[in-house]
A protein has these predicted regions:
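Double-stranded RNA-binding/processing signature
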Residues: 1-197
């Protein structure tokens, strides 16, 4: 990716990399790397793995420190709501991450840069890249700004999902897996209202 595009993204996220190849890898989907017969180190899957762990640590620490009267089960539910695919994809859209992704031709033509799963994975990869480049503190700052800043909205979304899931399971008396896709989001950044398709 051209350096000016990488600079633009770094300005957007408020972190400038010492090692730009980390950011480049975080933006490289496996479909893009596979088309070029690149080794697995040059796509974002390993960085996503690391970023997921950093995200879990930082969000757990945040919840533990800021919700002192919350019991373990509620802390677990809150963390799950903050780091779920839809929440991370929303955070990725906030920084326009889809515009910077390197996708294989098939993913690109089918709108992969807008897909929640690809966006959330890339977002975690960026967290992993920031962690490797600058350590835990800059990764924490990034997570605080883009994931944990809107905690009430994300908790409400998870609670709505949980209620729906419990209703479905009570009607069918079995575990039913539902998937959710964000269809529309409107309103100011600090108070967005979303509509999801189940």
């Amino acid at each position: 990716m051209k350096e000016d595009k990488l600079t633009q993204l770094q300005d957007e996220i408020g972190y400038h990399f010492q090692n730009l190849s980390l950011l480049n890898n975080a933006l490289t989907h496996s479909s893009y790397a596979n088309e070029r017969h690149w080794k697995y180190e040059r796509n974002n899957e390993r960085l996503e793995f690391l970023g997921d762990a950093v995200l879990e640590l930082v969000s757990s620490d945040y919840i533990f420190s800021n919700h002192k009267d919350m019991v373990e089960g509620k802390m677990t539910k809150l963390r799950a709501s903050l780091v779920c695919e839809m929440s991370l994809a929303s955070s990725a859209r906030e920084i326009k991450l889809g515009e910077y992704l390197k996708l294989g031709h098939g993913e690109w033509v089918t709108g992969g840069g807008k897909r929640d799963s690809i966006l959330s994975d890339a977002f975690e990869a960026v967290i992993g890249a920031i962690y490797l480049d600058g350590g835990l503190n800059p990764a924490r700052e990034f997570i605080l700004q883009y994931v944990l800043s809107d905690i009430e909205k994300k908790q409400l979304f998870y609670d709505s999902k949980t209620i729906l899931q419990e209703i479905i399971q009570s009607k069918f008396h079995e575990k039913t897996n539902l998937s959710y896709a964000l269809e529309k989001e409107e309103g100011p950044d600090h108070n967005k209202i979303g509509r999801a398709h189940v």
